[in-house]
Amino acid sequence: HVYPEIDKAILNTYFAENGAPIHLDDIREFIPSVCSIEIPYVDNAIRHLAQQGVIQLKDENVYPLQLKKAEASACVLIKHEKGLPWLDIAKLINGNNYSRSPVYEDRLDHEAFNQPEYIYLSGKGTYKHTCFIDVDAALIDDIFLEMMEYAEKNSRPVFHLNEFYQASRNLKKHDYYVIRHFVKHFGEDYGFYFDGKSQTDSIGLEKGFKNITQKDVIVEAMN
């Protein structure tokens, strides 16, 4: 048998984007599309990955066994359009052995949710796969333009994300946590610096700003 050497992580992104299990035929089609392997050797390559403990073959299905924690979270979340609490995600990953190292179940495992192209915080302690965000790129520009206008009108160096959200009909068409995801990961391109520590969701117009709390906003409005 010829066992072609292929990158052990070759399927990781595929699982993160499509979930598990994946039908063997889809894997057969995918592998030659991302590496220079000759078609007759694809089955050998798949068998070799299974022998190395990278994947598990069951009937005609392929399951991952060596994903990074965040890839494993994405793999689970693709099947849950409404999102899941972090503990449920951890239990599903560990129960299915999708990850090369177990995800903490006694506390939030930040490493398991730190992959913004696939995962976003969708509520208090719950996460969703980004494939369920229904917003196109042009709309993201519009969202930030509105935020810029608001920041110019209210000349302060730091804002609370909720202020922008409540002040804009356009932003309110989208879920708060979707806007939060955009600001957190694309904001710096538009001059907004996000800090989500301690649930404040503060946004500064300069890097390294001091956080504001909801109380600061209310007190300022009273003066």
Where are each of the predicted segments found?
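C-terminal non-catalytic scaffold/interaction domains in large multidomain proteins
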Residues: 1-223
